[in-house]
């Protein structure tokens, strides 16, 4: 492959690309040497991609030398395994090297196969490239666009105008959606839930560190759900609801947002409300978990089996028919009138 920079890949590199796309490798590290693209390191998969991520990638990152890293996920699309493309360009590397790697990046991706690359990360420090940095990147991707100065001023005005007397079911102004990162253990638990190795995952916000963390994964039946709802703190709950409906046995993922109202601080309520949609977006779009129903409650007593069933399968309201006007009698309308009016009586007497 020849490019604008004149960089070429050997046949050996192209063959390794092909084997990597077929799933043989977990990682390929690519360097540019003597105007050729070379593979300087490779690793084969032995565990899950998350377990191997930091151990495989971070030791390969040099403080003064750019590189590319292709890292294979365990998920697949129509073309095969999905990959993360990492462009490492440390701050202290030579400017010419930075420019060379930046100019060659697009063509390297094209040669490997853009359809296989799910995410692309650019980093100048190791924290950008670490697994935690990758999760932050995913969270930022699902976060709303930043506000302009005018929009930010308007938001602050609306927040100040909003009464602080807020109940769970009250419609109130909240902050713009905030996408806090999800810790590794929480993300892994959600993956296990998606694969039905767990049936319940509870998450909470670590407000001090601004991260969403795992709170509970206790095996849970429908009758146990009320016990899982804290009475003094907000939580996010994901439940695998196994049930029968119209003769079919179904497994449905249900999201429950519990907020016990005045026992939580205003800040906690606002943060849980603001983080909810970005979290759900990340789970539905990144983990590809289809959530059948999203429920908001203020206490666990509401979570009866009948309530949950009717939330997942709401009753269809029958069509209300308009009142039908009664039909008149068949044939002639009523008995013939026998009483004559005054004018008719005078005519008859004449």
From Swiss-Prot:
Residues 4-139, 177-313 form the ADF-H domain. Residues 316-350 are annotated as: Disordered. Gene3D superfamilies: Severin. The keyword Repeat applies. Keywords: Actin-binding, Cytoplasm, Cytoskeleton, Repeat. GO terms for biological process: actin filament depolymerization; barbed-end actin filament capping; positive regulation of neuron projection development; regulation of lamellipodium assembly. It is found in: Cytoplasm, Cytoskeleton. This is Twinfilin-1. It comes from Xenopus laevis. The lineage of its organism: Eukaryota, Metazoa, Chordata, Craniata, Vertebrata.
């Amino acid at each position: 492959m020849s490019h604008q920079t004149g960089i070429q890949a050997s046949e050996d590199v192209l063959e390794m690309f092909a084997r990597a796309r077929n799933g043989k490798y977990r990682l390929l590290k690519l360097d540019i040497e003597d105007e050729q693209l070379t593979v300087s390191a490779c690793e084969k998969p032995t565990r899950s991609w998350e377990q191997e991520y930091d151990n495989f990638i971070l030791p390969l990152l040099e403080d003064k030398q750019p590189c590319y890293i292709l890292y294979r996920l365990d998920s697949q699309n129509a073309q095969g395994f999905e990959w993360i493309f990492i462009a490492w360009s440390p701050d202290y590397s030579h400017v010419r090297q930075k420019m060379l790697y930046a100019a060659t990046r697009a063509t390297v991706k094209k040669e490997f196969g853009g359809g296989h690359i799910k995410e692309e990360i650019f980093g100048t420090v190791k924290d950008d490239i670490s697994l935690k940095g990758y999760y932050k990147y995913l969270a930022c991707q699902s976060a709303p666009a930043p506000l302009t100065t005018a929009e930010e001023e308007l938001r602050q005005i609306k927040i100040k105008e909003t009464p602080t007397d807020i109940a769970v079911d009250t419609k109130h102004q909240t902050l713009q959606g905030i996408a806090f990162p999800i810790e590794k253990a929480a993300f892994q638990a959600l993956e296990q839930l998606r694969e039905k190795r767990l049936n319940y995952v509870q998450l909470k916000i670590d407000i001090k560190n601004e991260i969403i963390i795992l709170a509970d994964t206790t095996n849970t039946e429908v009758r146990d759900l009320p016990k899982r709802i804290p009475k003094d703190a907000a939580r996010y709950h994901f439940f695998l609801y196994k049930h029968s409906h119209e003769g079919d046995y179904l497994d449905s993922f249900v999201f429950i947002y519990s907020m016990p109202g005045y026992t939580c601080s205003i800040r906690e309520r606002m943060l849980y409300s603001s983080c909810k949609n970005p979290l759900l977006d990340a789970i539905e779009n990144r983990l590809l978990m289809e959530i059948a129903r999203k429920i908001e409650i203020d206490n666990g007593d509401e979570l009866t089996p009948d309530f949950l069933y009717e939330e997942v399968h709401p009753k269809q309201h029958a069509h209300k028919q308009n009142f039908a006007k009664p039909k008149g009698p068949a044939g002639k309308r009523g008995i013939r009138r026998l009483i004559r009016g005054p004018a008719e009586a005078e005519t008859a007497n004449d």
